[in-house]
Curated annotation (Swiss-Prot):
Protein name per its UniProtKB record: 1-deoxy-D-xylulose-5-phosphate synthase
One example GO MF annotation: magnesium ion binding
Binding site for Mg(2+): D145, N175
Domain of life of the source: Bacteria
Lineage: Bacteria, Bacillati, Actinomycetota, Actinomycetes, Micrococcales
Top-tier EC class: transferase
Function: Catalyzes the acyloin condensation reaction between C atoms 2 and 3 of pyruvate and glyceraldehyde 3-phosphate to yield 1-deoxy-D-xylulose-5-phosphate (DXP).
Family annotation (CDD domains): TPP_DXS (cd02007), TPP_PYR_DXS_TK_like (cd07033)
Assembly with partners or alone: Homodimer.
Metal-binding among keywords: yes
Organism: Paenarthrobacter aurescens (strain TC1)
Keywords annotated in UniProt: Isoprene biosynthesis, Magnesium, Metal-binding, Thiamine biosynthesis, Thiamine pyrophosphate, Transferase
The record's free-text note on cofactor binding: Binds 1 Mg(2+) ion per subunit. Binds 1 thiamine pyrophosphate per subunit.
Length: 657
C-alpha cells in the first residue's frame, strides 16, 4: 500500500515526515498521470500544484478553514487529500466532477469555476466569519496568475485589504512562463534572506512599531511630516527593489514571496508566516504547469492544460478523430477573412488557441489582442474599436459571455457598434458540467435590441454566416456553434427569399403539412430524424433552418400559419429561447398555431457526455417524436390545430386552475 491510500482526510498529513511528504507528492503525480490519461481532464495545472496543495492542507484546518480554488480545475489534488480517490470515472456521468462540488464533500466551497471570482468569495466568507463571531477561522484562496488578469480579482483585493483583522490568505499560483523566477547566485542569496525579512515584516510588533512612528512623525509638525514622507519613500524604494511586492502592498496587503511552489518546506514556512500574521496576506508561489511530466513540459502550446485520453508514457492521444472541429473551421475562415479585410481584428480572453484565433494571429499578429480574463473589458474595447473604424471579432466560450452582458447591452448594442461575437462551446458541452455548458446565451441575447444571432448547422454554413456577420457594421452580431466535431453537411432543398433554408418537406413539395420543425444550429440532424420518424407515423412535416434566428424571419411566421403545430428544437434553455421569441412574433402577426419549445430546462445540468446530458433532458429523436405524435392526436398540450371538420380535443383530463 502506498502513502496516498492511507490519506483519508487532510489531518492524516500531519503524521507524515518531510521524507514521506516528498514520497506522497511523487505518488500523487503518478496517480494523476495514470488516471487523467485514461479519462481526460486538466492534467497540467494539477501536476503544478501538488506541493502547494499539500502545504495548504498541512497548515490549515479544512473544512473549518475554507479553501477556495480559482479556478476549480486545479482541485484534483485537493480531492485526493479529502477522501476522493476514485478517479476512474472522473468527469463522466455518475463520477467525480472535474471541479469542486459541494455534493461530493464538505471540503468544497465554490463550484462555478469561472475565473477571477475566488477573492470575492474569500471577502464575503471572511466578512461573514467576523460578523458571526468566528473571526479566528481562516479563508484561503488559491488563485492562478491568469485569474489575476480579471478586474473582479482586484476589486476584491481592494476590499479585503481595507480590513486588517480578517484572516484571509491569498495563495497566488504563478505558473506563467513570462513571470519565471530569476535564477543565479545573487537571486539564490536574496531567496535565502527573504524568509527572515518576511518573518519580520509580518509580525504584529513590526506593525505596531510602524504605526507608532507614523503617528509620532505626522504629529510633529511640518518637519516631522517631511521626515515621515522621506522615510516612507525610501522604505518603499528598498522594498520594491527587494521583491516584486509593491503592487500588492500599495493596496494594503502584506506580501510573502516569491516562494518555490514545488519546495514543500519553503511553502510550509511561507504559509505558517502568513497564518501567524493574522491579517490579509498574499503568498506568491512560483510553480510550473505540468511539473514532473516530460510530455507536458515539452508541449509549448499549453503544457497539457486539458487533455483527452492519452498514452501516459508518451502523452500522445490514443484516439485520433478524423472529424473536423467547429473551432478549426472557424479558425481557418476568420484567418482568410482577415487576409481580405484589414479592418478585421480579433479579441480573445486568454484563450487564443481554444477559441480558434491562433491562425489569424500567426498571419496578422498585430491585429489579434489577448485582453486576459477580462470579458467585460473585451466587449467595451471592441465597441471602441468599432467606433474607430475597425470590425472586431470577439471569440469567447459561450458560458463566458454571461460575464459581459451589461457591456454587450449598453456599450455595444446601444451604440449600434459593428462587433461580431463568436461563441464557441455553445449548448451542452458535457464533461465540464454546469459552469461550462453554453446553454444560456440564446435566451440572454434575445433581449438585446438590434442584435443579429446566427446558429450554423454545418461547416459550410459556419463559413457563410461568419462572412455575413462581419458584413454588418451597424449592429452587434453573434455566431454560435457547438463543442466538438462538425457533423455531415446538410444541404437545403430550397432557400427562401429571407435566407431561411428548407431542409425537408413532403415529396410532392406541398407546404400544407402537419408540423413545422424549426431546427436551431447543430440540432438540424436531430430535427431531420424526428421528421423521418413522424413520417413513419403518417404525420407530415416541414423542417427549416432559420440560419439567422434573430431577427425572426417573416417566412418562419408565414410557414407557421400553414401548419397545425410548430416545434422549435434548440440546445439552449427553453425559457426565453428561440422558440419563445418565435411564439411572440407569431402572436404579434395574428398566427394562432400552437408552438412547443423543445430545449433545455432551466436547471444546472451535471456533467456527462453531450449525448448523455441530452438524453437526460429529453432531447432525443424518440422522445420528441413521441410528444409530437401525442400533440397531433390531441392527447398532450400544446394541441395541434384540428383538421377541417374536427373538434378541438377534450381538456377534461387537464387540471382545473
Amino acid at each position: 500500500m502506498g502513502l496516498l491510500e492511507t490519506v483519508k482526510d487532510p489531518r492524516d498529513l500531519a503524521k507524515l515526515s518531510g521524507t514521506e511528504l516528498e514520497q506522497l507528492a511523487g505518488e500523487i503525480r503518478e496517480f494523476l498521470i495514470t488516471n487523467v490519461a485514461a479519462t481526460g481532464g486538466h492534467l497540467g495545472p494539477n501536476l503544478g500544484v501538488v506541493e502547494l496543495t499539500l502545504a495548504v492542507h498541512r497548515n490549515f484546518d479544512s473544512p473549518r478553514d475554507s479553501i477556495v480554488f480559482d479556478t476549480g480545475h486545479q482541485s484534483y489534488v485537493h480531492k485526493l487529500l479529502t477522501g476522493r480517490q476514485d478517479f476512474t470515472t472522473l468527469r463522466q456521468q455518475g463520477g467525480l466532477s472535474g471541479y469542486p462540488d459541494r455534493a461530493e464533500s464538505e471540503h468544497d466551497i465554490v463550484e462555478s469555476s469561472h475565473a477571477s471570482s475566488s477573492l470575492s468569495w474569500a471577502d464575503g466568507i471572511s466578512r461573514a466569519r467576523q460578523l458571526t463571531g468566528e473571526g479566528d477561522r481562516f479563508v484561503v484562496a488559491v488563485v492562478g496568475d491568469g485569474a489575476l488578469t480579471g478586474g473582479m480579482a482586484w476589486e476584491a483585493i481592494n476590499n479585503i485589504a481595507a480590513d486588517k483583522r480578517r484572516r484571509v490568505v491569498i495563495v497566488v499560483n504563478d505558473n506563467g512562463r513570462s513571470y519565471a523566477p530569476t535564477v543565479g547566485g545573487f537571486a539564490d542569496y536574496l531567496a535565502s534572506l527573504r524568509p527572515t525579512i518576511d518573518s519580520l515584516r509580518t509580525t504584529p510588533a513590526y506593525e505596531r512599531m510602524l504605526d507608532w512612528w507614523k503617528k509620532k512623525l505626522q504629529d510633529g509638525g511640518p518637519a516631522g511630516q517631511f521626515t515621515y514622507k522621506s522615510l516612507h519613500a525610501m522604505k518603499k524604494g528598498i522594498k520594491d527593489w527587494w521583491a516584486p511586492q509593491g503592487m500588492f502592498e500599495d493596496l494594503g496587503m502584506k506580501y510573502i514571496g516569491p516562494v518555490d511552489g514545488h519546495n514543500l518546506q519553503a511553502m510550509e514556512h511561507a504559509l505558517n508566516t502568513a497564518k501567524a500574521y493574522g491579517g490579509p496576506v498574499i503568498v506568491h508561489a512560483m510553480t510550473e504547469k505540468g511539473h514532473g511530466y516530460a510530455p507536458a513540459l515539452a508541449n509549448e502550446a499549453d503544457q497539457f492544460h486539458a487533455v483527452g485520453i492519452i498514452d501516459p508514457e508518451t502523452g500522445e492521444p490514443t484516439e485520433m478523430s478524423g472529424a473536423r472541429s467547429w473551432t478549426s473551421v472557424f479558425a481557418e475562415e476568420i484567418a482568410d477573412i482577415a487576409d481580405e479585410r484589414s479592418d478585421i481584428v480579433g479579441i480573445t480572453g486568454a484563450m487564443l488557441i481554444p477559441v480558434g484565433l491562433h491562425k489569424f494571429a500567426e498571419r496578422h499578429p498585430e491585429r489579434v489582442i489577448d485582453v486576459g480574463i477580462a470579458e467585460q473589458h473585451a466587449l467595451t474595447s471592441a465597441a471602441g474599436m468599432a467606433f474607430g473604424g475597425l470590425h472586431p471579432v470577439v471569440a469567447v466560450y459561450a458560458t463566458f459571455l454571461n460575464r459581459a452582458f451589461d457591456q454587450l447591452l449598453m456599450d455595444v448594442a446601444l451604440h449600434k457598434a459593428g462587433v461580431t461575437i463568436v461563441l464557441d462551446r455553445a449548448g451542452v458541452t458535457g464533461p465540464d458540467g454546469p459552469s461550462h455548458h453554453g446553454m444560456w446565451d440564446m435566451a440572454m441575447v434575445q433581449i438585446v435590441p438590434g442584435l443579429h444571432l446566427a446558429a450554423p448547422r454545418d461547416a459550410t454554413r459556419l463559413r457563410e454566416e461568419l462572412r455575413e456577420a462581419v458584413a454588418i457594421n451597424d449592429a452587434p452580431t453573434v455566431v454560435r456553434f457547438s463543442k466538438g466535431s462538425v457533423g455531415s453537411e446538410i444541404e437545403a432543398i430550397d432557400r427562401l427569399h429571407d435566407g431561411v433554408d428548407i431542409l425537408a418537406r413532403r415529396p410532392d413539395g406541398s407546404t400544407e403539412n402537419d408540423v413545422l420543425i424549426v431546427s436551431v444550429g447543430a440540432m438540424s440532424e436531430l430535427a431531420l430524424d424526428v421528421a423521418t420518424r413522424l413520417g413513419a407515423q403518417g404525420i407530415s412535416s416541414t423542417v427549416v433552418d432559420p440560419r439567422w434566428v434573430l431577427p425572426v424571419r417573416k417566412s418562419i411566421i408565414a410557414l407557421a400559419a400553414r401548419h397545425r403545430l410548430v416545434i422549435c428544437i434548440e440546445d439552449g434553455v427553453r425559457a426565453g429561447g428561440v422558440g419563445s421569441r418565435i411564439r411572440q412574433e407569431m402572436r404579434a402577426a395574428g398566427v394562432d398555431t400552437a408552438l412547443n419549445e423543445v430545449g433545455l430546462p432551466v436547471e444546472f445540468l451535471v456533467h456527462g457526455s453531450r449525448s448523455q446530458v441530452l438524453e437526460r433532458v429529453g432531447l432525443t429523436a424518440q422522445k420528441i417524436t413521441h410528444d409530437v405524435v401525442a400533440q397531433v392526436l390531441g392527447t398532450k398540450v400544446p394541441f395541434a390545430r384540428p383538421l377541417p371538420g374536427q373538434e378541438h380535443p377534450t381538456t377534461g383530463s387537464l387540471p382545473t386552475l
